[in-house]
A protein has these predicted regions:
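A short acidic, amphipathic alpha-helical/loop segment
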Residues: 2-6, 26-27, 99-103, 164
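Helix-loop-beta element that forms the nucleotide-linked donor phosphate-binding surface
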Residues: 23-35
Length: 187
């Protein structure tokens, strides 16, 4: 409710089709719903970015019907989004699933991955976001040049602390490619 009250209804929001519809019903006038692999090119002056919706899944197949749909996003920055100068992947709140294996084929050469971690559990049982092991598994699938864990301690339902991910990263040999940032620190 607090977010709804403070949300600028005129700001552009790129999200899932279902969330775009719900936001429009709340009075947001510039929502864009992207299904998996849909693209949106955005230009402002000479600045260009292509946003590609990547697959995400908030729960196991049976639980998906009870949870909102989610998406990741790939941002291609540069004068020609088809040949980006920089490519960034934001996982969104997903779990590991087979569709993630399509990412390196469809959008290869990811420079930076922002990994939503935390191992969120609903009712203490149902995992709906990646934990430490899942985060490393995603790194192995997507093979980004660099990665930063985010969204790992924002709520009490997060059960997989950042220290667990740091241990898994080191054990998997990814220590030189993963950067750990304190809140407010820049990359």
């Amino acid at each position: 409710k607090r977010v709804q009250q403070k949300l600028d209804k005129n700001i552009p929001i790129v999200t899932t089709p279902g969330a775009a519809k719900a936001l429009k019903n709340l009075g947001c006038v510039r929502t864009i719903g992207l299904a998996h692999w849909d693209r949106l090119d955005v230009e402002k002056g000479s600045t260009r970015v292509r946003i590609t919706s990547a697959p995400g899944r908030h729960g196991k197949l049976g639980a998906q019907a009870l949870l909102p749909s989610v998406m990741g996003a790939v941002y291609d920055f540069g004068a020609d989004p088809a040949q980006p100068a920089y490519r960034m992947y934001v996982t969104g709140d997903t779990l590991i699933h087979d569709d993630l294996k399509d990412i390196p084929q469809r959008v290869p050469g990811i420079d930076l991955a922002l990994l939503h971690l935390g191992g969120t559990r609903i009712l203490g049982v149902f995992k709906v976001t990646m934990d430490a092991q899942d985060g490393v598994q995603l790194l192995q699938i997507v093979q980004p040049r660099h990665a930063i864990p985010i969204h790992y301690n924002d709520y009490d339902v997060f059960k997989s602390p950042l220290a667990d991910f740091a241990r898994e990263v080191k054990a998997a040999g990814w220590g030189d490619r993963v950067r750990f940032l304190a809140h407010g620190e820049r990359y």
